Amino acid sequence: MAERANLVFHNKVIDGTAIKRLISRLIDHFGMAYTSHILDQVKTLGFQQATATSISLGIDDLLTIPSKGWLVQDAEQQSLILEKHHHYGNVHAVEKLRQSIEIWYATSEYLRQEMNPNFRMTDPFNPVHMMSFSGARGNASQVHQLVGMRGLMSDPQGQMIDLPIQSNLREGLSLTEYIISCYGARKGVVDTAVRTSDAGYLTRRLVEVVQHIVVRRTDCGTIRGISVSPRNKNRMMSERIFIQTLIGRVLADDIYIGSRCVAFRNQDLGIGLVNRFITFGTQSISIRTPFTCRSTSWICRLCYGRSPTHGDLVELGEAVGIIAGQSIGEPGTQLTLRTFHTGGVFTGGTAEHVRAPYNGKIKFNEDLVHPTRTRHGHPAFLCYIDLSVIIESDDIIHNVTIPPKSFLLVQNDQYVESEQVIAEIREGASTFHFKERVRKYIYSGSEGEMHWSTDVSHAPEFTYSNVHLLPKTSHLWILSGGSCGSSLIRFSIHKDQDQMNIPFLSAQIKSISSLSVNNDQVSQKFCSSDFYDKKKSGITDYSELNGIVGTSHYNFIYSTIFHENSDLLAKRRRNRFLIPFQSIQEQEKEFIRHSGISIEIPINGIFRRNSIFAFFDDPRYRRKSSGILKYGTLRADSIIQKEDMIEYRGGQKFKTKYEMKVDRFFFIPEEVHILPESSVIMVQNYSIIGVNTRITLNIRSQVGGLIRVERKKKRIELKIFSGDIHFPDKTDKISRHSGILIPPGRGKTNPKESKKLKNWIYVQRITPTKKKFFVLVRPVGTYEIANSINLATLFPQDLFREKDNIELRVFNYILYGNGKPTRGISDTSIQLVRTCLVLNWDQDTKNSSLEEVRAFFIEVSTKGLIRDFIRIGLVKSHISYIRKRNNPPDSGLISADHINPFYSISPKAFILQQSLRQNHGTVRMFLNSNKESPSLLILSSSNCFRIGLFNHVKYHNVINQSIKKNPLITIKNSSGPLGTAIQISNCYSFLPLLTYNKISAIKYLQLDKVKYSFQVINSYLIDENGRSFNLDRYSNGVLNPLKLNWYFLHQNYYHNYCEETSTIISLGQFFCENLCIAKKEPHLKSGQVLIVQKDSIVIRSAKPYLATPGAKVHGHYREILYEGDTLVTFIYEKSRSGDITQGLPKVEQVLEVRSIDSISLNLEKRIKGWNKCITRILGIPWGFLIGAELTIVQSRISLVNKIQKVYRSQGVQIHNRHIEIIVRQITSKVLVSEEGMSNVFLPGELIGLLRAERTGRALEEAICYRAILLGITRASLNTQSFISEASFQETARVLAKAALRGRIDWLKGLKENVVLGGMIPAGTGFNKGLVHCSRQHTNTLLEKRTKNLSLFEGDMKDILFYHREFFDSSISISKSSFSRI
């Protein structure tokens, strides 16, 4: 022993790691025997001190970390900010989830790192601290849950639970945290027992594969090796892993530093030599591994290396295979036990960041980066190659190199502070992660109408599907609105843009006169311009017919033809109509009947060919009761201009209307009641009741007849069929399917006596049960159709007309399809037939391109009497009337190409009055392609909010007073493409055309040119280009009525005028919450601008949802979504949870070579990089052999890395050589292919790779085969010993097959000798006769190498074995790689 003076004295705490180092140094200096004696003394000393100290563990020893409070508070603040960004639509759900995980995981990790210094400073002899860090019991993760926080939990599938547990076990858990903890932990005796059995079975399978691997030789003579380098192409290998990989190995080549050889071939590596390699910075070191051993059924000493037990080369006869199987399988039991202790705590990882070394300005080449979004939704730049970033300070310039595929988080010329994060390094593509593709479903949080921008693919993914794909990042919007009950949809007479009251249990048509604003106002004129140029803006015609009055998209004019047709004065001169119409004041004085002609004018005044100009509902064709329409023998033709039309991207959908060709149809009446699902029905199905019978508690029947009750989704439909019931004989033939109409004279009401019928009847077969049926004879109403409008009377011939281009045609339409039910609400009548006037004009050669006419409202003043007319004339160009809405290019907001398409078109409109509740709203109508009935969305004042744009308290009253001086200013410039104005704060908003007085109206309204006059606050000037100049320095906003845009002005006090500004608020624009439109102005909520007015804007509330490329949108544009409906599906790739319970299944998955659930998204890029190296070896001799070797070697390295990654993530240290022995066995077989039939092996036969090479060399014949990857189970059933195979699985099949083939078992392995009771052929003391003598002269083997081998020897070493991780993905080797000898 060394002298006492030379001993080193250490005065510090020795933990488990220090003990390991101490033992290692003792073994190196004193050997095994003396080291064991020293350690025995250390053990005795430890027990004595522990007894004297009398350490006990109590609850008071669990000390919470002081910094936990502010760390948790900071994490909550970050989560709150993240929640706000998600609410504003800046990040989507997946980005929010990822960032939330990292926030809480980082907080938990900080607490865990603070735990050890806290104990060390406050109480170094704390029992919990000494227990956890001595390695005796518990670890840092478990103690962290006691004194830190439990953090995020995993569910049984390994997915993260979004709610973190902030408490620790010392503080106690709340009820919610306890339930999450129980759900996440899901531990118990059964789970632990199952995991333990899995670990034991894994160990058994591993031992089955390698039980015959015994050290039989000293040197196999191989010249191959695997290169290990601390600096790989893709990433740096940590020094600790580098040392663990090299220690105990044997060099395959000499190591030179400069010209001096520092290590020789076949020299084993110790810690001293490895440290010297690290110090001198050796680039690559070639080592021998079990992969490179040339022995087939055993292994040599030099390829195995040092024995971990003795620290010397492994001895001959050592059963290293069983040691390897036990070394891998036994930690699986530890994983199971550790699972129970940790309890499902989620573990993850954080990205590596690059920070600025000091303050300075960032400089980099912007051409080498591309803008993108990080996985957290933050804006960043992506660099594809190494990017040099220069940080310029006052006195120094620092250069930072950002590796490829990293995110740059700062902009060019941005000033950064010291330690600020400037880049985020993405993990290299070669690093293996268990990734999986996950679907994240986003559900609608509210009820409303779905909108999206032009970024969404409007064509569905599949035919007849409602799934749309996103080509790039965009917003989805749920516009607020309440839907009416589904039971009332079919019977509703409301159309798009109708004003109504909610609920609408009883509906009656009301005059438009209720919408007048003030009785003392001038006659209201309806005129506006279309704000879109379809040809210029690139937007298809979504806003052709846009509403301007509070009733609909159309202007409804009730003409004066209600009593006599001659009251309508019609003049046709110069290819135009002049039709007078009434003003609202005139309508208020006299009662308007509902049976008059309703003239429909689009808002832009443009009629296309065959479009409906007016319609007339004849009261003779109205019914108050519900029923079914029949006209089976009629011929129905669809016309060009359909009545209910919805235009959207991708096509047009029409609700068909039928043109009558025969003047008779039939109506079969029935009484229908739609009841809620919870209603109490007091009658039975198929029963007969009389008139005024109580059906429910508050409903009585209007007619008598047969009761039919049908229960549907969330409602009950009760029908009463009036008529007679007959029970026919078997001889009567009654249609089984639908009813039949029987004309008069053919009736047979009684089989014994025949009787002629006077009227039509409807015979219907009703089957209450399978065997019984009866016939219901129902009365039928017959309708004859006659011409109700005489065009000659309406529009008399005009002697002064020049050409008769424009004409009106009369069409009669049946509003319901054949066999379709008609439904009425309460006392509302049902219109069966509608007479429509359709505009048409002749096409000549000069005007062949004219496809539209324009209608204008004009006013003619004669002797103080004002008459209003409609002028209809052919127009050649509508560019002068249609203005393109455009935002200035510097506005930074949505351009005209991104404006959403606006609402659909419905010609009919009614105003509904409800006396029950005064909740006013507007109907939005949608047609669902899958449903016959339309659905309604009611937009009420609760879904919108008004924001005043002038909120300066100092000048607010002045503005209000100036508005009150002129009552015309209160008439708001409204609406535009978005349709009806909403009643908010009892203020109606329409009438875009204003006149100053009755006498001067003709000056502003000319016949040939419509001159638009508008009213703005006097201090604003708007020129013809829309540029705004403000002479009042106290206001900062101005409305441009022609474009319906708000301009916010920045004042210039030096010149006393305002500069030209960009558009901030436009009609129809979507914007997210927290948008600050100007200084001292309110922050707007998210929504869509519905109305733009002089002093305020009305915004429809909307909820934005951000979606990234590849997401799938469920539902069509403008479809009604209910709360909880699936809105978007995100498909993203995430790393599988690092939960410790998943460790054992991952190892088993890799060893059994099972295919993973989904392939990594970047697998294609990896294969491309892999193929680049393959091209270097094509076209040279022995290329097939190299291809097979390449496949096998790279798959071996990949498998070793995967298994090591799993165990290292759990803190389990396993030497690579153990895993290499296992992987060598499952990759040592090749599959003989059918090409190039061989006389030796059968196609599909599994043979060893070395055997195939030697056989081909001996026969001088090329044997075609391909590499195959076997699992440990298949490898156990494909060995040289059938006794070993039969003792594992499938005993009968294996023995029968071996007997038929005449297989011979040479009993070389351990297991077959155990089965037969022989001596185990292993052990260092075994008979030396079985141990093969090693070859002392390797030069003999070198001389036997052929010249061909020398051709590619260097390439083999460089190409195949230089990179440690070449192809890191979970692959099944099925690629055909033929080897030719």
Curated annotation (Swiss-Prot):
The keyword Transcription regulation does not apply. It comes from the Eukaryota. Disulfide bonds: none annotated. Binds 1 Zn(2+) ion per subunit. Zn(2+) binds at residues 220, 293, 300, 303. Keywords: Chloroplast, DNA-directed RNA polymerase, Metal-binding, Nucleotidyltransferase, Plastid, Transcription, Transferase, Zinc. SUPFAM superfamilies: beta and beta-prime subunits of DNA dependent RNA-polymerase (SSF64484). In plastids the minimal PEP RNA polymerase catalytic core is composed of four subunits: alpha, beta, beta', and beta''. When a (nuclear-encoded) sigma factor is associated with the core the holoenzyme is formed, which can initiate transcription. This is DNA-directed RNA polymerase subunit beta''. The lineage of its organism: Eukaryota, Viridiplantae, Streptophyta, Embryophyta, Tracheophyta.
